[in-house]
């Protein structure tokens, strides 16, 4: 019996899907706690690529119970497409459950997301424009539509008319946008409700009972620590809590249930969208890492910004999440890059150095990275099965990251397939 959380330690896209998939293969229950279809997990298994946005990665295992918690905002249109995609590949959905408390992303949320970003102009946040922020706004304004409402047509119609009327007023009178046909939305989304009704159940109760029965549970986080609404690089963050504490809130479980918290990082750093990025590489090395690592967004297709590994960031994540261990992905991408730099501290404008991540954006923007240079490696490490098989400089790199981050590196990804993992 165990309960573990998998958390991103950087700005997302760390390869959590791969680590989650490996752990999910050993779990009885896999739970998604927060976020929406703005997040994407890519899992490569048996030559088949699965791109999951809302459905937990455990769906690939027929005996694994897959749960979507109350902290998630669910886009029914995209969700049904994902259901169709899984079914077309022969994946059973019998073990899928959705908490009735989860909030629903509606068309007006998506419209308002885009209009708001457009209104901000050069000060835009760089959202995925999938309505996540506006959906969470309604949740905390206590005016949101939940999955329970969606699967009860009369309740849904009443709430949709009320919400839609107000949102159309904002869309047309504040932003000058085109109004949404509310009745058409009700008709369309009522059908989505019928489709997903059979999956609705109380996730908090299911998880609690599974724990009492001694089952192995894994909680998968979406996004990452530096996108957390409180502990990320605000305002360039998501609208929920991707940190470990957010998992407990988003699924309705107590923190004493959790046995292990695993943080996932890349062997370098990437970021999508705007905001400070101390170790960013705007040169040929950055382009090489991007192309070798396939650094393009699962959800948006946007090219990711690339940079050297930042130990200041990961140390912040170790502390904020209470990490038990780390998994480092895409070590193979760094083969042939040359000497490797690691950010060990930040230098402030007055010349002083700090080793803790700044709490506010304004301070971070003024920081310059302080690097330590390590010997690179040219060998192909994709077939290595153990830590001892790695080149000496490769092992030294991992050991240095472990020392700087103050957390054991227990897993090393050395290729895209789920089998390309070294455990130590």
Feature locations, PLM:
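Non-transmembrane, aqueous-exposed alpha-helical and coiled segments at domain scale
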Residues: 1-424
């Amino acid at each position: 019996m165990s309960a573990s959380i998998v958390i991103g330690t950087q700005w997302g896209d760390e390869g959590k899907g791969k680590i989650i998939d490996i752990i999910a293969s050993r779990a009885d229950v896999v739970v998604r706690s927060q976020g929406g279809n703005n997040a994407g997990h890519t899992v490569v298994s048996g030559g088949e690529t699965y791109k999951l946005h809302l459905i937990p990665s455990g769906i690939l295992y027929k005996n694994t119970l897959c749960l979507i918690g109350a902290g998630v905002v669910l886009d029914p249109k995209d969700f049904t497409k994902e259901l169709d995609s899984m079914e077309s590949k022969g994946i059973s959905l019998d073990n899928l459950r959705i908490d009735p408390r989860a909030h629903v992303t509606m068309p007006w949320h998506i419209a308002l997301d885009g209009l708001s970003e457009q209104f901000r102009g050069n000060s835009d946040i760089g959202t995925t424009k999938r309505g996540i922020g506006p959906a969470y706004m309604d949740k905390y304004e206590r005016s949101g539509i939940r999955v329970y409402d969606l699967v009860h047509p009369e309740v849904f119609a009443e709430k949709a008319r009320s919400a839609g009327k107000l949102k159309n007023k904002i869309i047309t009178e504040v932003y000058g946008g085109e109004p949404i046909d509310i009745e058409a939305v009700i008709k369309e989304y009522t059908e989505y409700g019928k489709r997903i009704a059979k999956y609705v159940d109380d996730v908090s109760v299911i998880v609690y009972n599974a724990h009492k029965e001694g089952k192995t549970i894994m909680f998968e986080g979406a996004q990452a620590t530096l996108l957390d609404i409180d502990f990320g690089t605000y305002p360039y963050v998501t609208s929920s809590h991707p940190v470990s504490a957010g998992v407990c809130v988003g699924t309705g479980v107590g923190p004493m249930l959790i046995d292990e918290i695993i943080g996932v990082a890349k062997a370098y750093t990437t970021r999508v969208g705007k905001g400070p990025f101390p170790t960013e590489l705007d040169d040929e090395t950055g382009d090489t890492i991007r192309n070798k690592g396939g650094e393009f967004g699962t959800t948006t297709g946007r090219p990711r910004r690339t940079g050297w590994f930042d130990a200041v960031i990961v140390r912040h994540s170790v502390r904020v999440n209470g990490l038990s261990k780390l998994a480092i992905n895409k070590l193979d991408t760094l083969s042939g890059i040359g000497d490797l730099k690691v950010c060990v501290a930040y230098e402030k404008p007055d010349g002083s150095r700090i080793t803790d991540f700044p709490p506010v954006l304004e301070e971070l923007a003024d920081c310059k990275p302080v690097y330590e240079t390590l010997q690179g490696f040219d060998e192909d490490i994709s077939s290595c099965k153990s830590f001892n098989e790695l080149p000496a400089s490769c092992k030294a790199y991992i050991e240095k990251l472990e020392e700087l981050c103050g957390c054991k590196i227990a897993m090393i990804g050395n290729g895209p397939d789920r089998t390309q993992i070294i455990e130590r």
